[in-house]
């Protein structure tokens, strides 16, 4: 069945969201139109404002409406000479939720992927190199995803940091707390054995 052009456009627009197929998009559109137009207007306003006003921090590249994000602008960060390199702004939120890191971040907004046309320029590595060359960074902590692309990106950045004589470390990978060994994949288990620590 064909809907009106505006309803079709709404359904198609909702499909741009990750994990939203035609049926889910249709359900969302109908929910907003049938039962919650007020929320639909609020969503439209928030989306419009965010798309217009949210940009990237000039220092770390995470999302912000200001020139500097709250983390980079804060004078209360205890270890401002530490930079944790992550792939996405969501990674920053995950690390911040843990409350164990008080340094700064650098958000790549992706990972190296030559087949997809993503190289060092697309990841803002010239800005990261500027930070490294400033002499204000004592350690770079690489927290890219444990994938082939994430590992390649980490090695590329590690080589870059070593040229500036900056210490480089990578977050540990292994068995999750509370996890059972029988459910852990062999690669993760191998990383756990290789990264074991003395007690």
From Swiss-Prot:
Name used for this protein in its record: Recombination protein RecR
CDD domains: TOPRIM_recR
Domain of life: Bacteria
Family to which this protein belongs: Belongs to the RecR family.
Coiled-coil portions: none
GO molecular function terms attached to this record: DNA binding; zinc ion binding
Signal peptide annotation: none
Keyword set, alphabetical order: DNA damage, DNA recombination, DNA repair, Metal-binding, Zinc, Zinc-finger
Zinc finger (C4-type): 57-72
HAMAP family for the chain: RecR
Xref: InterPro entries: DNA_Rcmb_RecR (IPR000093), Rcmb_RecR (IPR023627), Rcmb_RecR_Znf (IPR015967), TOPRIM_dom (IPR006171), TOPRIM_RecR (IPR034137)
Gene3D superfamilies named among the record's database cross-references: 3.40.1360.10, 6.10.250.240, RecR Domain 1
GO terms (BP aspect): DNA recombination; DNA repair
Domain Toprim: 81-176
A Pfam family per the record: Toprim_4
